[in-house]
């Protein structure tokens, strides 16, 4: 009996893996042992919750329902939560097949969809991260994950062995407290994952994530020494899993799948929505702007107004069918992000510098949004694949678990 460990490294791009191999020795070694997708297509938009959800479901946001970190629920834009996922997930399918499933810190999974579960360390205030200017309070879907107490006994046993019993409250102090809680939270989830994978009777599927690279890049910027450290930190956590499996004699019998939710790249400018569209209800989804509209006529009027500023309307086929008359999606070309308002010193401006020097979720086909996929383990071919679709991640993991087809993708291994 051996585990499949699925790790998501937030914000680690295809370009990072190609350009910084010396800083990413564990990912590089894994890529040489198995299958490596050099450029995995991002989702639309290439933001955190759509990316996490597509990894689990293998379908696009029109089907799984999570079309942004913020989604329109018919009355307001709010943060998406695990209860918003409409499509079957890897964890649900694995449970239904009688497999043991451990979800440790991976967002967008419900507690009931795992046999061993711990919420994401950031779940208590649902993405109330350092970069959120006006956080939306956590809703019940996220609070339910943070209230969950694992009943499997696995995490309690890990604590008895000397590993951390829980994670710090990231929101109990200043920004330094937040950063250290993030680094600690990521490490704890991976330490638990590594220990479970190396245990005598491991879960069949272990799903975890590392958030640090995304947060640090947003604040420090592309290729900043701090950002490069964050990439190396994520790589070192992958190495913890590899070493634990090696020490236990399970490395050759276990499967590791590592991917990311989106890439990262320089933000050249920001467009300020309160000046572009005063009085509208909108949500800034990185380089995509969602505007609540009352039907196609209002959407056309908004599109005409934004076109004056070089902003084009997206077709909207990535939106769930019932939202296409209620939400219009727009994008600006280049490395442009939308922000609710200008900083105080630029009050009233239409555009200016971004608050965050590095970002993601830009116009479709922006190379910096591309990500990667690495799979290594029994039966996984040693090969490199230039390009693959987002849906191929779930299809590949499902096949490796013997679950049959899942989603709209193809098996890559």
Predicted regions and their residues:
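Beta-strand elements within well-structured catalytic alpha/beta cores of enzymes
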Residues: 2-17, 29-30, 55, 94, ...
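Short, structured active-site-proximal loop/turn typified by the sulfatase FGly-forming signature C/S-X-P-X-R
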Residues: 17-54, 58-59, 63, 102
């Amino acid at each position: 009996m051996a585990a499949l460990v699925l790790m998501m490294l937030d914000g680690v791009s295809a370009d990072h893996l190609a350009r910084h191999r010396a800083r990413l020795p564990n990912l590089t070694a894994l890529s040489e042992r198995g299958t490596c997708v050099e450029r995995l297509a991002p989702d639309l938009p290439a933001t955190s919750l759509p990316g996490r959800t597509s990894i689990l479901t293998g379908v696009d946001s029109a089907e799984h329902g999570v079309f942004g970190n913020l989604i329109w629920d018919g009355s307001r834009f709010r943060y998406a939560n695990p209860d918003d996922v409409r499509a079957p997930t890897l964890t649900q399918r694995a449970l239904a097949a009688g497999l043991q499933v451990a979800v440790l810190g991976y967002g967008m999974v419900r507690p009931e969809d795992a046999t061993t579960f711990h919420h994401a360390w950031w779940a208590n205030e649902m993405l109330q991260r350092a970069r959120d200017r006006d956080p939306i309070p956590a809703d019940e879907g996220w609070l339910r994950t943070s209230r969950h107490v694992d009943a499997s006994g696995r995490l309690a046993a890990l604590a008895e062995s000397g590993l951390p019993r829980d994670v710090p409250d990231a929101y109990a102090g200043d920004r330094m407290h937040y950063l250290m809680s993030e680094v600690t939270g990521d490490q704890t989830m991976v330490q638990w994952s590594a220990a479970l994978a190396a245990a005598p009777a491991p879960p069949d599927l272990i799903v975890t994530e590392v958030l640090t690279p995304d947060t640090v890049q947003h604040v420090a910027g592309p290729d900043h020494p701090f950002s490069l450290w964050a990439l190396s930190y994520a790589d070192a956590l992958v190495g913890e899993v590899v070493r634990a499996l090696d020490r236990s004699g399970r490395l050759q019998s276990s499967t590791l799948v590592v991917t990311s939710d989106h890439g990262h790249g320089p933000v050249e400018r920001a467009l300020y929505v309160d000046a572009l569209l005063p009085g509208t209800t909108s949500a800034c989804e990185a380089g995509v702007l969602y505007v609540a509209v009352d039907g196609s006529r209002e959407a056309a009027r908004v599109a005409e107004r934004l076109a004056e500023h070089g902003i084009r309307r997206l077709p909207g086929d990535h939106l769930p069918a019932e939202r296409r008359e209620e939400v219009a999606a727009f994008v600006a070309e280049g490395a442009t992000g939308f922000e609710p308002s200008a900083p105080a010193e630029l009050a009233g401006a239409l555009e200016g510098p971004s608050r965050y020097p590095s970002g993601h979720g830009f116009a479709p086909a922006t190379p910096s949004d591309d990500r990667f996929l690495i799979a290594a383990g029994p039966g996984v071919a040693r090969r490199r694949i230039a390009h693959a679709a987002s849906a191929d991640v779930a299809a590949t993991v499902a096949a490796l678990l013997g679950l049959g087809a899942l989603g709209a993708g193809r098996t890559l291994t």
